[in-house]
């Protein structure tokens, strides 16, 4: 992943929640987003995310679809029921067919394929 901060101003003032089990990906995302001035909270799995304070409508949740245990699609379904709903960005290294199967029946969310581009991620915030 490109971890050098792009020359993009902070788009909003909420918290970014990262739900990612790979410490390397999670740390890289946190480094990039904090360098841009964002408040970032990392969660290594869905269970710890569910135990934390729920995100607000001004927040962004970046969730890995391939989480062990409770999967990323389950997290997205839970987030879709919130009002106000946070912005959701799904990340995955899975093939397109798996992505389609995981997200079938869910409202459209932004999906980024790993390896991630910092510029593309920031453009979705």
Report the location of each language-model feature.
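Two-component/phosphorelay signaling modules centered on CheY-like receiver
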Residues: 23-41
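Acidic, metal-coordinating helix/loop segments flanking the phosphotransfer/catalytic sites
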Residues: 42-60
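Acidic catalytic/metal-coordinating carboxylates
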Residues: 45, 71-74
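The feature encodes the CheY-like receiver
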Residues: 68
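Short amphipathic alpha-helix used as the core "switch/output" element in two-component signaling
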Residues: 73-85
């Amino acid at each position: 992943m490109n971890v050098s901060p792009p020359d993009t101003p902070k788009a909003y003032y909420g918290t970014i929640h990262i739900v990612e089990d790979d410490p390397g990906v999670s740390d890289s995302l946190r480094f990039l987003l904090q360098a841009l001035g964002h408040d970032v909270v990392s969660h290594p799995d869905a269970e710890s995310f569910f135990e934390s304070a729920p995100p607000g409508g001004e927040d962004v949740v970046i969730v890995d679809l391939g989480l062990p245990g409770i999967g990323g699609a389950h997290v997205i379904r839970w987030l879709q029921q919130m009002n106000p709903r946070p912005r959701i960005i799904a990340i995955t290294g899975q093939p397109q067919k798996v992505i389609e199967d995981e997200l079938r029946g869910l409202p459209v969310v932004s999906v980024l394929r790993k390896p991630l581009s910092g510029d593309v991620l920031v453009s979705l915030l």
